[in-house]
Amino acid sequence: MAQFFKAKPNSSKQLSAKLSLSVNQLDHLGAGIAQHQGKVVFIPGALPDETVTVQFTEQKKNYARAKLIKVDTPSSERVEPECPHYHTCGGCDLQHMSLSGQREHKEAALLDIMAKFAGAEGGTLSPELTGEGWHYRRRARLATLFDKNTKHLSLGFRAASSSNVVPISQCQVLAKPLSDLIVPFAKLLNQLTAKASLGHLELIAADNGHFAVLRITKALNDKDLAKLSAFAEQHQIHICLQDNEGQFQGVGAELVLPVYQLLDDKAESDAVSLSFTPGNFVQVNGQINKAMVAQAMDWLAPALDERILDLFCGMGNFSLPLAKMGADVIGVEGVAEMVTQARVNAKANNLDKLTFFHGDLSADLSLEPWMGKIDKLLLDPARAGAFESLQWLKKMKPRKVVYVSCNPASLARDSAVLLERGYRLQQLGLIDMFPQTHHIEAMALFELTK
């Protein structure tokens, strides 16, 4: 039987060679894109209009990946990263690009994919929702790593595409008061007798104070609890422990829940307060979240007694403001704990024109008690999108649909469904929720035309 020789695509010679490439654009993950011998080459850290020296790390039939060795001709958008941990930490991936350049890239990428699938054009674009480029995160989870040999506990973030923990002393995108707590917390945790059994540390900045949630795998002794309590008092922070069952316990005091406000830029009577447990999802950029909610209210323009459905409602981030403005709101969420918290928030704000349901929004919705004719629809799904939920549009027939997206790909796919059902894209806007990263969020307004 004849045998044919086939060269191995990833030979050491092919991968070790260095070459110069010209970068022409960024991909959706923020990596530079170049062309070489008919292949697309992805180069993390490279920017458009740059000439770079690279070394291949992976070769496939139609594409390759390369490591940036040197920037030979820099882009005018290239800047020096502000964070000393940038090149090892996996949190940010665009600090080497100017903030204006990041936003220009994100808006162009959003418009490009939405033009292909939803007929978006330049005139459809609304002004970007932008805020502070640094210290904007009000929440972050730090990983811990205990070294059995040195008996030292490291506190930091995971490296890119790795489970390795990169110890950090600061975070340039985390709220400054929280960033300033990283080193003191690392010292404190290393003083605990139970440091080998500690899990992650979550830091939260809320309108009613600063919070820390420490994951533990076994109960702490009195000495460790006393150290945590003293630290909490010294740094004016609420500390709570989360055990293996997901239960939370306050340290040195009763458990206090973090709270944030919405619509508080108007009259005090218009504001709504949302409390959440450390396990609940909240938008990490408080400044942009307020702007996002305000824009959704403006686009939906809720009127008195209108029936508005809020799918993937979480703990009421959009539902409560809609009800505050007079609409009859139905919120549906797939996570039971979030539904419970949404009901708590509605009661705390004395909002009775608001009903929450727990349900699987990817399942058959035809028999759900809330299914039926509505005036308007708001969607805020996870990255997977809302494709299954949109199959029931004929039964709901909303005049307006506001879609809040954290994934342009699923937004584009779902937009095609809306267009098929007789809706037209009226407005599209970038939401820069995560500056210094490649992540793109957006809001789209669709109106029924037939």
Swiss-Prot record:
Belongs to the class I-like SAM-binding methyltransferase superfamily. RNA M5U methyltransferase family. RlmD subfamily. Pfam families: TRAM, tRNA_U5-meth_tr. It comes from Shewanella baltica (strain OS155 / ATCC BAA-1091). The keyword Thylakoid does not apply. Keywords: 4Fe-4S, Iron, Iron-sulfur, Metal-binding, Methyltransferase, rRNA processing, S-adenosyl-L-methionine, Transferase. The keyword Ribosomal protein does not apply. It catalyses: uridine(1939) in 23S rRNA + S-adenosyl-L-methionine = 5-methyluridine(1939) in 23S rRNA + S-adenosyl-L-homocysteine + H(+). Catalyzes the formation of 5-methyl-uridine at position 1939 (m5U1939) in 23S rRNA. Residues 12-70 form the TRAM domain. This is 23S rRNA (uracil(1939)-C(5))-methyltransferase RlmD. GO terms for biological process: rRNA base methylation. [4Fe-4S] cluster binds at C83, C89, C92, C171. Its EC number is 2.1.1.190. S-adenosyl-L-methionine binds at Q283, F312, N317, E333, D360, D380. InterPro entries: 23S_rRNA_MeTrfase_RlmD, MeTrfase_TrmA_AS, MeTrfase_TrmA_CS, NA-bd_OB-fold, SAM-dependent_MTases_sf, TRAM_dom, U5_MeTrfase_fam. GO terms for molecular function: 4 iron, 4 sulfur cluster binding; iron ion binding; RNA binding; rRNA (uridine-C5-)-methyltransferase activity. It is an enzyme of class 2 (transferase). The active site is at C406.
